[in-house]
């Protein structure tokens, strides 16, 4: 229950419908309370208190959109009804409707007794809007009015904005021991301390691929329809030019690829900006309802293989090296148990030189028992909310080095936790040399699996402050990326979510936990309208600062009929200003975007993007940004480590400073990016040092490396 409701519970005691509702509310019997408050409103429509308590019921159940109307009625009928307008402001804040929130808080100020908490709510709203000076003033007003929680919140506000010493003083005065420890451990490393620079505007040229992503939609609104399609950028024929693979749907409800329009597709890079469909030759059309893809060389033979997730079955395709693939799913033992798998990632979790496989599972679903879910209007059918389905455990397969895998989900500790997984990202958040796993969960807390060594994982999402966003809410988390966006040597995590939720940016703090900086980074305000799916943290303008791409599209195809949000949405890039804030750029072309993968498809030193669109052509977004900076791209070849060098940690030093990046192909939502590691260098034409920490433990160093080149580095 929201903390700001607790003060009301103790005031309740029952004869009328209103009193009976209050008594039920005090017992947390929200079903009865709702019934009684609705009855009270029928008996007396102008009863502001009945409307207010009905809103409190919906808020206690986290049905915030339902709570808006009763709070709005209560505030309109009697602005002086205790907390009515304040509660309305808080609901608007939770729904990220910041202008409406401020208007409601202004009304709440008519009640002198509510000034402290109202100024506190206004401060949070103003910060979310980027009006930091006004936010600080209202924090101070709230503190002066005696709001106890405001001083602690003000301390964290100061920390988010780089004012560490002032933050420490405020947190000491508030007696906030846990927050004080976090800030103390981050001394000298708080965000927002560098000078801002306006990044070079980005330009992309959109080119369609010759296929249609077919979700098999029938009008029945099967949940799988809205969830495809993953995409991979990888070099399948080792010609040095990245190619593209796309996972496609199937007929419904049968979940079979009944014609060629449902086949997965492989496109060969022709090196001239065009791509040739080589699916038939490669033998990789697939079967069933495919969802996502993960690309890597699992058998260390020098050829990149593909793992394709799907509904009821997964598939592993071994690259033969002659332009064809062999389906080795059964022999390898990775077909799954019939569950719905959305995404997957390759990682060497035990550093034995062989890539293991992590599979993200969503929820228990069967087309034969699809629910008929409405969308707030009689007669309309919509995609069912995940709350109607049971969660699933994820799976971990250990590479046996002989072409087979062993399911270690239970013994590793992974299967102990059930979620509704959508995206997966791999990194080493505590720099202990072992790969950790982040899983973006839909409407339930995210997972962070800490690699304990000896084949064991411990789920630490809550203590690491990454299970929920900064408002302690579980979001509809979709895609994720795990990279160091602020060049401090620690990998951060970015997550996409649905519209009105905002996209959290979790900065990795020195003590190993995370802090959600989506508000001070300006990402929160920019992301409110969008439903994000795949994402990637890459330096698109080569200025030495990693930017954030999000593929956007509403989860429902008739959003305009029930809300102000658009169904088809443009993609966005949050360009990094270098001071902890980002500038949002909206790219041309609205669609139901889903998967996105990243790589330099035309080998010009600029990162391109390939994006899938429901029931349309996928597109290649060729990066044609003007006045782009210098760059370098590194292709690692493991000898003692896995052949792809996945997991290697790379540190470069130039006259302008330090940067870090990791070799990984897992990215975004159901997608897989080129394993070649890219660094933008700005004005620097020489790299002073390149240091590589290989998964094997070998440390390798290169000096005085010229920029603007592709460099292959073999482990030695």
Predicted regions and their residues:
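Register position in tetratricopeptide repeats
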Residues: 26-27, 60-61, 94-95, 128-129, ...
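Repeat-based blade/solenoid architectures
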Residues: 209-230, 282-294, 334-345, 390, ...
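Gly/Ser/Thr/Pro-enriched helix-cap/hinge segments flanking short amphipathic alpha-helices
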Residues: 210, 217-218, 522-525, 556, ...
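Beta-propeller blade termini
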Residues: 228-238, 268, 289-304, 318, ...
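Hydrophobic beta-strand segments that make up the repeating blades of beta-propeller
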Residues: 244-248, 301-310, 357-361, 437-441, ...
């Amino acid at each position: 229950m929201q903390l700001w409701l607790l003060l009301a519970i103790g005031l309740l005691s029952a004869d009328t419908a209103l009193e009976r509702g209050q008594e039920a509310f005090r017992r947390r019997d929200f079903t009865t309370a709702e019934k009684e408050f609705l009855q009270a409103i029928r008996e007396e429509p102008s009863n502001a208190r009945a409307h207010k308590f009905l809103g409190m019921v919906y808020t206690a159940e986290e049905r915030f959109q339902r709570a808006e109307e009763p709070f709005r009625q209560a505030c309109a009928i009697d602005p002086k009804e205790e907390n009515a307008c304040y509660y309305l402001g808080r609901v608007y804040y939770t729904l990220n409707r910041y202008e409406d929130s401020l208007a409601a808080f202004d009304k709440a100020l008519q009640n002198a007794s509510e000034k402290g908490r109202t100024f506190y709510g206004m401060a949070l709203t103003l910060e979310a809007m980027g009006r930091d000076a006004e936010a600080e003033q209202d924090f101070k007003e709230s503190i002066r009015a005696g709001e106890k929680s405001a001083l602690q919140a003000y301390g964290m506000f100061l920390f988010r904005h780089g004012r560490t010493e002032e933050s420490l003083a405020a947190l000491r005065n508030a007696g906030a021991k846990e927050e004080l420890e976090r800030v103390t451990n981050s001394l000298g490393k708080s965000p927002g301390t560098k000078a801002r620079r306006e990044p070079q505007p980005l330009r992309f040229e959109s080119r369609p691929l010759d296929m249609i992503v077919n979700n098999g939609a029938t009008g029945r609104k099967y949940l799988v329809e809205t969830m495809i399609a993953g995409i991979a950028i990888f070099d399948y024929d080792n010609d040095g030019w990245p190619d593209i693979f796309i996972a496609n749907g199937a007929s419904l409800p049968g979940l079979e690829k009944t014609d060629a329009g449902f086949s997965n597709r492989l496109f060969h890079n022709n090196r001239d900006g065009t791509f040739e469909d080589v699916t038939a030759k490669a033998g990789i059309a697939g079967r069933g309802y495919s969802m996502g893809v993960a690309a890597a060389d699992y058998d260390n033979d020098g050829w990149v293989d593909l793992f394709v997730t799907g509904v009821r079955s997964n598939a592993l395709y071994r690259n033969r090296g002659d332009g064809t693939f062999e389906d080795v799913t059964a022999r390898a033992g990775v077909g799954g148990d019939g569950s719905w798998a959305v995404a997957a990632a390759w990682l060497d979790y035990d550093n034995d030189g062989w890539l293991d496989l992590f599979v993200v599972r969503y929820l228990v679903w069967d087309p034969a028992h699809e629910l008929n879910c409405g969308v707030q209007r009689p007669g309309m059918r919509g995609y069912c909310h995940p709350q109607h389905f049971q969660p699933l455990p994820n799976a971990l397969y250990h590479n046996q080095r002989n072409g087979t895998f062993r399911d270690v989900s239970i013994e590793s500790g992974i299967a102990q936790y059930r979620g509704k997984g959508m995206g997966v990202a791999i990194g080493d958040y505590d720099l202990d040399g072992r790969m950790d796993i982040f899983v973006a969960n839909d409407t339930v807390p995210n997972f962070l699996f800490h690699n304990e060594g000896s084949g064991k994982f411990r789920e630490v999402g809550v203590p690491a402050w990454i299970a929920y966003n900064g408002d302690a809410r579980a979001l509809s988390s979709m895609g994720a990326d795990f990279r160091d966006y602020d060049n401090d040597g620690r990998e951060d995590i970015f997550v996409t979510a649905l519209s009105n939720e905002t996209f959290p940016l979790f900065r990795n703090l020195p003590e190993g936990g995370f802090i959600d900086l989506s508000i001070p980074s300006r990402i929160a305000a920019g992301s409110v309208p969008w439903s994000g799916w795949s994402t990637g943290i890459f330096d698109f303008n080569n200025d030495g600062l990693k930017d954030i791409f999000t593929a956007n599209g509403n989860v429902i195809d008739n959003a305009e009929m029930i809300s102000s949000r658009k169904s088809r949405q443009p993609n966005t890039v949050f360009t990094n200003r270098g001071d902890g804030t980002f500038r949002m750029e909206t790219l041309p072309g609205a669609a139901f975007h889903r998967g996105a993968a990243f790589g330099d498809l035309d080998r010009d030193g600029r990162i391109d993007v390939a994006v899938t669109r429901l029931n349309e052509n996928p597109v290649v977004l060729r990066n044609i940004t003007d006045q782009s900076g210098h760059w370098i791209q590194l292709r690692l070849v493991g000898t003692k480590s896995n052949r792809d060098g996945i997991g290697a940690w790379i540190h470069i030093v130039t006259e302008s400073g330090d940067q870090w990046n990791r070799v990984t192909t897992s990215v975004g939502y159901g997608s897989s990016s080129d394993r070649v590691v890219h660094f933008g260098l700005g004005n620097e034409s020489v790299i002073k040092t390149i240091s590589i920490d290989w998964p094997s433990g070998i440390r390798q160093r290169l000096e005085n490396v010229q920029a603007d080149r592709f460099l292959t580095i073999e482990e030695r």
